[in-house]
């Protein structure tokens, strides 16, 4: 594992979404830092909570924006968010029950975020008015 670096190919061109995605990357890097520094379980859990809470807030914002512009694939996009949220909850529960799932959670966040931005979020960009970019 290593710190993530934001690259321009991850930009959607929608400023508010890009800022939120960059913030999620910061939270992922915070988790990596906590794990690398062998922070205690409470500190790691706090970082996990911040990461998960912010990601869920981002999902709600993104879904609201897509609804506002009548994005035809909103239900499918929401379903992807819900599947991911279920995976994250499972890993957080495993972490809470003394199974060290923090590295697995970090890896899931990295893989899912970049794939989601490049393959799923990119699909809705043409449907959002340029005034929102």
Language-model features: where?
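Small-residue-biased structural context
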Residues: 1-133
């Amino acid at each position: 594992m290593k710190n993530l670096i934001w690259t321009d190919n991850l930009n959607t061109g929608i400023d508010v979404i890009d800022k939120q995605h960059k913030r999620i990357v910061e939270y992922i890097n915070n988790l990596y830092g906590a794990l690398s520094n062998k922070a205690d379980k409470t500190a790691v859990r706090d970082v996990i909570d911040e990461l998960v809470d912010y990601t869920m807030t981002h999902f709600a914002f993104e879904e609201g924006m897509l609804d506002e512009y009548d994005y035809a694939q909103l239900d499918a996009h929401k379903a992807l968010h819900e599947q991911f949220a279920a995976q994250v909850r499972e890993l957080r529960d495993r972490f809470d029950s003394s199974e060290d799932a923090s590295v697995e959670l970090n890896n899931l966040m990295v893989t899912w975020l970049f794939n989601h931005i490049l393959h799923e979020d990119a699909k809705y960009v043409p449907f959002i008015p340029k005034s929102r970019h």
